[in-house]
């Protein structure tokens, strides 16, 4: 095992010189700097500068490192523990437990975090819908089991809340194995999620990996690969269907951008690293379904300054089967989840996949919301009185549809005091069909806000002193 020494430290980037007559460590190999008997720092080889000098990225803080310190080559990339024993545990980028639990023995199976994507002939595709219990998602941008989903939105519009709700709903209903990867997000949110999952009994089926905001960029760059390696083991070796949650994929790009200039690369568009597309491709191509098992990936994507043309979110778009776009204007109206029903999309919204009735109701919902969107300019200038009776009816139904797309979340119950609701797809379709067919025209708009199935609307309206006159709505209420 070759040994070198530190010749330069620039923030998270460390240059290490090895003797030229010995074999140099390979790119992506892990190096270990021995600070003291019980303390060491892991570096990852990124570039060869010539004359035996390697440029590396530190996975931990470089405080206390100095020139001349000894560095040893581990002879392999960073490796992390895998298998059933990782469930219910919390790890850092190096696969070290950070939950206060026991460390893994040295002979425990481990896998390197750098791997090739599965071969083309091993891939498989599924057209099975993954029910989430969230009305706006299930109706307008259904998620595919074994597919990739992106939750796009600016700061503070509810990406993490939706991810947490999806973990709550899918992990409890689907009951499979989940891997949660926190990439460069708030430690508080990770802490809340850990205790929530522990309380709800979901933690025993979940492995968690964190490289949060306070970590050096090296850890934030590689932690997504650590989480993915755990998920790949469950898929390839145990043949499981795995859910992989990544919050937030933008921070993966941002960390790469932070170290890119220090590595000596010329910045590309908007100051991002020139290798942005390659890095994103290497990660996303590994998140896929094979003949052995599947990985369903749900990724939160921060949109800087709400600009969807920014290279980081736009590079991610290319890999996704469904996109859920969160809109700040809906947050301002108090509509949660603030999903834009016209901008969000899914490749699965097809009559051959979701069925004819689902497809027709979804397109009618989009049509009525689009028409309302077009009429808003007239309403803001001339008022409602200038609309025809037919247009007034469209506006009234569209507003009810818009409010009915909102929903109370289980994970937000501690803040709102209102219990959450899980709505099956059949119930969602039935509810929107009743609104669009005019069966609930005489109910007040407020009855549709923040409710679960359509029965909740009827109960809420009754509490407001309004009973529907429509026979179909009455029959539902009596049930």
From Swiss-Prot:
CDD domains: ATP-synt_F1_beta_C, ATP-synt_F1_beta_N, F1-ATPase_beta_CD. Keywords: ATP synthesis, ATP-binding, Cell membrane, CF(1), Hydrogen ion transport, Ion transport, Membrane, Nucleotide-binding, Translocase, Transport. It comes from the Bacteria. The keyword Membrane applies. GO terms for cellular component: plasma membrane; proton-transporting ATP synthase complex. ATP binds at residues 153-160. Produces ATP from ADP in the presence of a proton gradient across the membrane. The catalytic sites are hosted primarily by the beta subunits. F-type ATPases have 2 components, CF(1) - the catalytic core - and CF(0) - the membrane proton channel. CF(1) has five subunits: alpha(3), beta(3), gamma(1), delta(1), epsilon(1). CF(0) has three main subunits: a(1), b(2) and c(9-12). The alpha and beta chains form an alternating ring which encloses part of the gamma chain. CF(1) is attached to CF(0) by a central stalk formed by the gamma and epsilon chains, while a peripheral stalk is formed by the delta and b chains. This is ATP synthase subunit beta. It comes from Lactobacillus acidophilus (strain ATCC 700396 / NCK56 / N2 / NCFM).
């Amino acid at each position: 095992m070759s040994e070198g020494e530190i010749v330069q430290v620039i923030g998270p980037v460390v240059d290490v010189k090895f003797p030229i007559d010995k074999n140099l460590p390979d790119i992506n190999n892990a190096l270990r700097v021995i600070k003291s008997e019980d303390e060491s720092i892991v570096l990852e080889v990124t570039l060869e500068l010539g004359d035996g000098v390697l440029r590396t990225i530190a996975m931990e803080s470089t405080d206390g490192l100095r020139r001349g310190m000894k560095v040893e080559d581990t002879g392999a990339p960073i490796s992390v523990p895998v298998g059933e024993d990782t469930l219910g545990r919390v790890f850092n980028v190096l696969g070290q437990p950070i939950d206060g639990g026991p460390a893994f023995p040295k002979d425990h199976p481990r896998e390197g975090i750098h791997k090739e994507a599965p071969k083309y002939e091993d891939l498989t595709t599924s057209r099975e819908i993954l029910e989430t219990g969230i009305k706006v998602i299930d109706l307008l941008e259904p998620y595919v089991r074994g597919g990739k989903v992106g939750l796009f939105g600016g700061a503070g519009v509810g990406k993490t809340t939706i991810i947490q709700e999806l973990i709550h709903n899918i992990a409890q209903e689907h009951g499979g194995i989940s891997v949660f990867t926190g990439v460069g997000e708030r430690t508080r949110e990770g802490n809340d999620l850990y205790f929530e999952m522990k309380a709800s009994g979901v933690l025993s089926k979940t492995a968690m990996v964190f490289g949060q905001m306070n970590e050096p960029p090296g850890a934030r760059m590689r932690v997504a690969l650590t989480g993915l390696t755990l998920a790949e083991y469950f898929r390839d070796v145990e043949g499981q269907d795995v859910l992989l949650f990544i919050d937030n994929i933008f921070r993966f790009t941002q960390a790469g951008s932070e170290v890119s200039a220090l590595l000596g690369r010329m910045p590309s568009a908007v100051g991002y690293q020139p290798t942005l597309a390659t890095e994103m491709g290497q990660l996303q191509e590994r998140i896929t379904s094979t003949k052995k098992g599947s990985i369903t990936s749900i990724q939160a994507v921060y949109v800087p300054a709400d600009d969807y043309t920014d290279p980081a979110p736009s590079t991610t778009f290319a890999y996704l089967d469904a996109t859920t776009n969160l809109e700040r204007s809906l947050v301002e109206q108090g509509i949660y989840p603030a999903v834009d029903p016209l901008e969000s999309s899914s490749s699965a919204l097809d009559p051959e996949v979701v069925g004819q009735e689902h497809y027709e109701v979804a397109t009618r919902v989009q049509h009525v919301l689009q028409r309302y969107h077009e009429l808003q300019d007239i309403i803001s200038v001339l008022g409602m009185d200038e609309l025809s009776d037919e247009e007034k009816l469209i506006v009234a139904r569209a507003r009810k549809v818009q409010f009915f797309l909102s929903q109370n979340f289980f994970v937000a119950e501690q803040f709102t005091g209102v219990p959450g609701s899980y709505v099956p797809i059949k119930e969602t379709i039935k509810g929107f069909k009743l609104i669009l067919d005019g069966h609930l025209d005489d109910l007040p708009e407020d009855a549709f806000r923040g409710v679960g199935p359509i029965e909740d609307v009827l109960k809420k309206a009754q509490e407001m002193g309004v009973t529907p006159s429509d026979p179909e709505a009455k029959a539902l209420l009596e049930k």
